[in-house]
């Protein structure tokens, strides 16, 4: 069994730029405690012995820049940089097309801008995929969740969803390679776009299990997220 990791990193980071006074650059290039966010993410997966290779999908005009970072931090033997697409789904699909896998192999998909994923959680996700064929990291809901209907007057609550039925999906999301390929092929044939890989796999009829996540496995999206991530990182270093 081999484990391949796909890191979609072709986003523009428009939400981060909207609230920032600094010159705009994609989130994966921002520095967290002096090291690019993407490099923190690569380090976490490189620390897991089961991981065979990582594929980073970036915008075509950023391939050279990312490859230079990969080389600078010594990941060139384990990381490939490929051209992504205009959406997350396109980027993952293009990266997946470069993976030569067999029936026993596993593919993990992880947001490049979740730099604080812990190697132990990655390992547990791999174990869960070995058992069930599909698993994601999820964080149990702590707030009361309301279902709403959008109207001209604003959002109207239509139901309260019990928290025990809710998890906030995180990454990595892992699948047997052939299952993920089939899910992407069916989605493309039907013109379906999902917000994550699990939604495509669910649609293909497979059951997806959940591995407990952590609040520190945050996605850097908004201004202020870098400061919070730095706090988590310093806290982890002081253990």
Curated annotation (Swiss-Prot):
Name of the top EC class for this enzyme: transferase
EC number(s) recorded for this UniProt protein: 2.7.7.60
Pfam family, one: IspD
Site, Transition state stabilizer: residue positions: 15, 27
Provenance organism: Acidobacterium capsulatum (strain ATCC 51196 / DSM 11244 / BCRC 80197 / JCM 7670 / NBRC 15755 / NCIMB 13165 / 161)
Protein family (similarity comment): Belongs to the IspD/TarI cytidylyltransferase family. IspD subfamily.
Molecular function per GO: 2-C-methyl-D-erythritol 4-phosphate cytidylyltransferase activity
Record InterPro entries: IspD, IspD/TarI, IspD/TarI_cytidylyltransf_bact, ISPD_synthase_CS, Nucleotide-diphossugar_trans
Pathway terms, separated by semicolons: Isoprenoid biosynthesis; isopentenyl diphosphate biosynthesis via DXP pathway; isopentenyl diphosphate from 1-deoxy-D-xylulose 5-phosphate: step 2/6
Protein name as catalogued: 2-C-methyl-D-erythritol 4-phosphate cytidylyltransferase
Substrates-to-products reaction catalysed: 2-C-methyl-D-erythritol 4-phosphate + CTP + H(+) = 4-CDP-2-C-methyl-D-erythritol + diphosphate
The entry's keywords: Isoprene biosynthesis, Nucleotidyltransferase, Transferase
UniProt record, GO biological process: isopentenyl diphosphate biosynthetic process, methylerythritol 4-phosphate pathway
SUPFAM superfamilies on file: Nucleotide-diphospho-sugar transferases
UniProt site positions, description: Positions MEP for the nucleophilic attack: 163, 219
Function: Catalyzes the formation of 4-diphosphocytidyl-2-C-methyl-D-erythritol from CTP and 2-C-methyl-D-erythritol 4-phosphate (MEP).
